[in-house]
């Protein structure tokens, strides 16, 4: 698959923002719920440098793009540190962890609303949405860059924000020990089951590398389709 360098830069930019939003939200929520650990480490910021992970923000996205030719790069930041005993309520850590993927889902909703506003208020925005969608989904098309309206880069960034935030929301909710889904499951399972889950984490990771992409696509595809239909019909 041929790669458009400008599109890749847009995707990586949106991915880094989505990861920073996820980590900053978890850090802020943990602090509000009683655990200042992440705040004291400067993690309640959208500054990507505070959440940087070489593997999650550089190696994994580049592998996804250039080796596996994924539709979108995906990644993660440094794990947000939380100290369970600092939470005054038993479900404090659970809610703090859940806030990350929920923030990404809400970001996708906000991007959709922004696109709808631009669609109905800015000249040529509506006519450009088909091109935006085709480029974002890597559909081969011929585009006359000189004929595109000035608002086009904003439209593309917003549409990619929908895609990226939905993708990372689904990805983060996978039941793997190093992701939010795994951290949430540990809180739900009985003690012995949670210990067994952590003990066999290596096998879960192996399973992810084998079928993780398929599992993500099962949820991500229909979610993106719903947002795309809403964008076209409203």
Residue ranges and their predicted role:
Residues 1-234:
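Hydrophobic transmembrane alpha-helices and their immediate loop junctions
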């Amino acid at each position: 698959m041929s790669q458009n360098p400008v599109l890749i830069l847009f995707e990586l930019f949106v991915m880094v923002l989505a990861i920073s939003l996820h980590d900053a939200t978890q850090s802020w929520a943990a602090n509000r719920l009683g655990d200042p650990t992440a705040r004291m480490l400067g993690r309640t910021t959208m500054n990507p440098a505070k959440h940087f992970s070489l593997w999650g923000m550089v190696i994994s996205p580049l592998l996804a793009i250039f080796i596996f030719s994924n539709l979108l790069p995906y990644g993660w930041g440094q794990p947000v540190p939380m100290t369970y005993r600092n939470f005054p309520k038993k479900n404090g850590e659970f809610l703090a962890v859940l806030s990350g993927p929920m923030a990404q889902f809400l970001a996708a909703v906000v991007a959709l609303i922004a696109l709808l506003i631009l669609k109905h208020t800015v000249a040529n925005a509506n006519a450009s949405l088909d091109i935006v969608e085709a480029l974002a989904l890597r559909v081969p098309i011929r585009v006359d860059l000189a004929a595109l309206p000035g608002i086009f880069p904003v439209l593309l960034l917003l549409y990619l924000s929908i895609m990226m935030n939905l993708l990372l929301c689904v990805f983060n909710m996978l039941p793997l020990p190093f992701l939010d889904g795994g951290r949430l499951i540990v809180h739900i399972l009985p003690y012995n089951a949670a210990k067994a889950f952590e003990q066999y984490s290596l096998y879960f990771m192996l399973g992810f590398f084998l079928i993780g992409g398929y599992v993500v696509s099962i949820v991500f595809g229909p979610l993106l389709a719903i947002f795309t239909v809403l964008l076209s019909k409203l």
